[in-house]
Amino acid sequence: MGKKNEITEYVAAVLVFVCAVAVSLGIFLVCTQNSIERNSQKVIKTNVSRQSEHIKTILDIHYGYLRGIAKEIGKSEELVSDENMEMLISLEEETALERTALIEADGTAHYDNGAEKNVSSRRYFKEGMEGKETLSDPLESSVDKETRVILGVPVRKNGKVTGVLGGSYNVTALSRMLFNDFFEDVGYTLITTSDGEIIAYDGNPAYHEIKYGDNFFEFYDDQTLVCGSSLTEVKRDFAMGASGLMKIRNGNDYNSDRYLAYTDVGLNDWMICYVIPVSEAQKSYNFVRRYELMFTVGFGAMVSILFLWGVVKNRSKNKQLIQAAETDALT
């Protein structure tokens, strides 16, 4: 009887130990996953914020190019001259500006390729004539479907604005360049207004079906937002120009989980967004999961061996007890 109680106590102690280790392992795995989630989200938000600053820096550099040429043009006797048009051609050739134009006070634009057009009704021209550096609303090309904006600076002569110098910049190519090496070029980028109008997009079409002019909030309205995210909060962030991140899912398909990080560009009311599958964002942490799997399998194997050893040991003890009971002590 004493031996039986001893075995029972031993089994109970082993079960308590195994349960304690199993609970600890579960807590460890949950905490590890939460840590991976936080770190991957932090990396995405940090990179999107940096790329937003990069966009402003690049456009500021090109504003600087335009200012320098506008200053030289302001020194000439005539606004539109062969010498000034040659500077426009050089500006287009030496910078990322795809088309440059010198605009007279009446709105007549003289382009570097020799074309002429009246742009007196355009906002960027009106703001330029008011002495402001201006950035136009985005326009999608009917030829290559790329989105471009016009950067404009005033041309001053003797302190008076006599015209506007403008150059077009491909913001689709810019967003592509910024995120080309981000998570091995997986996912896609969006540039939107604070109202959610999509003005530029780029990325692998396997991950999105967005078109120019779509509304950001309408596009994601039928998506499931997880981890406490809501489109109402995102709309508020867009209106305030705040940064944020949400996790989205197609219905109940966990394999479709994506992170969407966004931040203010600091130009007009633009927001830049980056969308990437969660599996890709957490890819660099796969080695942690491999170690977790190895540890879990190893722990399971050890528990199984311990259990089998206990069963064998218990059977051996029972066999010895039966033999002892059946043996005549006097023989």
Where are the predicted features?
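Extreme N-terminal signal-anchor transmembrane helix of membrane signaling/transducer proteins, especially
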Residues: 1-38, 297-301
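Extracellular/periplasmic juxtamembrane segments that couple receptor/chemosensory ectodomains to their
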Residues: 217-293
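Extracytoplasmic/periplasmic ligand-binding sensor regions of membrane-associated signaling proteins
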Residues: 94-96, 105-181
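Cytoplasm-proximal transmembrane signaling helix
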Residues: 18, 279-321
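Conserved nucleotide-binding and Mg2+-coordinating catalytic segments in signaling enzymes
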Residues: 322-331
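Solvent-exposed, extracytoplasmic
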Residues: 80-96, 164, 168-218
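Extracytoplasmic/periplasmic sensor domains and loops in membrane signaling proteins
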Residues: 85-86, 112-140, 206-248
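Extracytoplasmic/periplasmic sensory segments of membrane signal-transduction proteins
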Residues: 42-51, 57-136
